[in-house]
Amino acid sequence: LGNQVTPKILFDFICNYAPHNNGVAKFAPYGLRKVEAGLLRDGFKREDVVVAHPDHIEKFIGPETEVVGTHEMDPLGMGPVTMTFTYGRKQMSYDEFYCRHLHQRINAAKKKTGSHAKVIAGGSGTWQYNYAPEKIGEYGLYAILEGELGGIAPEIDGHAGNFFNYLIDGQFENMDPFRKRKDFKVDIKEFKRSDKTHHGRFVNFWDRPDLDEIPEIVEPSMHGMIEVMRGCGRGCKFCDVTLRSLRYYSPEKVKKEIEVNIKKGGVDRAWIHSDDIFVYGMDPTTTKNMEPNRDALEELFTAIMSTGVKHTNPTHGTLAGAIADERLVPNLSKITNAGPNNLTGIQCGLETGSVRLIEKYADRKLAPYQPEEWHWVVKEAVKTLNENYWIPAFTLIMGLDNDETPEDGWETIRLISELEREQPDSMFTATPLTFVPIGLLEKSEFYDIGSGDDPTQLGVMYKTWQHNFKYGIKKFMTKTGQKGSVRRTAFNGLARTLGGIPLGAMEKFARRRGPKFERVIEKIKTNYW
């Protein structure tokens, strides 16, 4: 692993323990639970399907094992968060470290037991093997499952039985890549790297299952997560989810999955996954300006709370969607009992303060507003969300499509500073992430923050971290979350004690890079602190 930003002993302490029952995972990623449910629905016996805890995978690999599937969200550390905090993979991430360790143990178990199980990697991160194909052979991967456009995870839960039967029967070995099929296509890719050639079997799947073909989970998902919709409809060029067609779960379907988490997992909260909760129930083909469907959202959250959960929050939402209907967020807050002791977190893509970049890459993200109104939308949304006890966690993209100018970066810095000054009691966090080529920009290049000559990107990182430490960690982050938890108390103490260290590290980096980097840091301290 080498010299990590976060020492391994600290990472292992912070990383939540996942319980198991004789090696069977009590909780599992939601997508994996969907595949499990699809297999059971399609005729596989319960004793033949197991979602194994990764620490106990060896218990379930033997001579009779046909398939070992791994759920991989960021297997090689190329996701935006990981790329940012490993300086563009200059250090090995814990994602990559533990994924490699898992595959090493799978291969060791196969060798020990004489198993001929086919190992297949699936999940939203399998596109990364296209950039590091040497890992395919190193990990002994029989196949890699990916969507038609790589970055988007395929929806095999609607056809799980067919997929695994094809695997077991060996049909993917001789499937004609040129034959028109309605479900799967096999592509044997060749990658030339230096003096070596690597090959990989990529199984593409692009069929869109109808709602009645999508199974409901039968065992608990991690963190009480359940999805309420697929797709987004906003059309941001840098996002892969927008490539997926829109479908909405009925409130009844949502309730059934929450009840599984309550009854089998003892969970008292529901983490509602969507890629923009404010799109739920909307028909973007007829709703020209993407105004939210307030009635549908109120019905959805009323159904969620009727299950008896104490807390619920959506994973993602747009700032424009939060304010497009002035009654929406206040009404939802009443339904969910949001308040000072029951704050609602939501991740929102701020992306950039640059009006130019927003208009070029994400203009429908602002609908029903116009790109030139972007700063007003951000400020008004923070005000509205906070007044109703919602806390947005902003993500930003640094080096968007390698098209970001210094002035674009300064617009972002100024916007955050204006929010602090105009709304001194506001609650939000801001996390800058390096650009990763997915979605409609998958042919672009990764943005390498470590080798760039523009000091403004360091300034964006510096300003956002200063905000998170001064306004986030010290003012409200340590006041939320699980009360009385030893782990939470310890984490809060670490955050308050160590939270300022990255600022010093960035100042040191600026001194090492030279005067123009130092001037950016000093300008922020003088004008935007």
Please give the residue ranges for each predicted region:
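Conserved, mostly hydrophobic/aromatic
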Residues: 232, 254, 348, 416, ...
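Conserved SAM/AdoMet-binding glycine-rich loop
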Residues: 259-391, 398-400
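Catalytic cores of alpha/beta
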Residues: 130-139, 331, 401-418
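Radical SAM enzyme core and accessory elements
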Residues: 1, 459, 463-529
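Residue-level signal for the nucleotide or nucleotide-sugar donor/cofactor binding architecture
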Residues: 206, 249, 373, 404-407
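Acidic, low-complexity intrinsically disordered segments
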Residues: 2-3, 7-256
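A general structural detector for well-ordered alpha-helical segments in enzyme core domains, enriched
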Residues: 35, 98-109, 254-257, 293-300, ...
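Flexible glycine/acidic-rich beta-alpha junction loops that bind and position SAM and/or redox cofactors
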Residues: 76-81, 274-286, 351-363, 396-407, ...
